[in-house]
Amino acid sequence: MYRLLIICVLILASCKQEKPEIELTLAQKIANAHGFENWDKVKEFHFTFNVNKDSSHFGRSWVWKPKANEVTMLTEKDTITYNTSKIEQESINTDRAFINDKYWALLPFQLIWDTSATLGEPFKVEAPISKIELNKVTLTYPSDGGYTPGDAYDIFYYDYFIIKEWVYRKANANEPSMTNTFENYEKFSGIKIAQDHKKAEGNWNLNFTNIKVITE
């Protein structure tokens, strides 16, 4: 009886020590699959945003210091630095460009950061470009606030939560405004970034170069 009592006490003690597993949200699963758990160590994020269409090229470079709330844009004509925690009137256009370019680079993390947006329920569907069966979930923004209110994004991802394609629908229109791939993934200090975003047809590629992630 005494031995049985000891065993029961040990079992109860073991149960108390075991912490229940917390079920991650879909947004967390997608973000973590792309390295979000490493973001808190990031001091600087450098990247160049490019759009290549046929023989034309557009590009601008960024240095983002998230812990210092500082962003610098570098183009052939200008170098502009501003504080993201207090955006002055003269910095709005630069900030608008940064938000756009960062969104393409770090879409999985925006699922966590953009708390005002709504992430719907996922379901299986044929992806628009690859024509393979993927999970689809829609991210919808509120109709007021932000630079592009009311927009929606249909995100197509694998069962292991890596994003493969997306459809952008301006103002949550029924028809796609733009459809692109997420490809040529590479890790930078644990952050997984799709370096190329192509269309189904045409010589068009939105891509990232000069990526550098500096951590603490």
Region roles according to the model:
Residues 22-24, 33-37, 117-126, 202-216:
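Intrinsically disordered terminal and processing segments
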Residues 18-23, 85-151, 173:
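Flexible, processing/modification-adjacent segments and terminal tails
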Residues 1-7:
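Sec-dependent signal peptide recognition
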Residues 132-216:
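Gly/Pro-enriched, hydrophobic low-complexity segments
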Residues 11-14:
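C-terminal motif of bacterial Sec signal peptides marking the signal peptidase cleavage site
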Residues 46-48, 61-63, 72, 79-81, ...:
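Ser/Thr- (and often Asn-) enriched beta-sheet segments in non-cytosolic proteins
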Residues 19, 23-92, 119, 128:
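N-terminal mature ectodomain segment of secretory-pathway/periplasmic proteins
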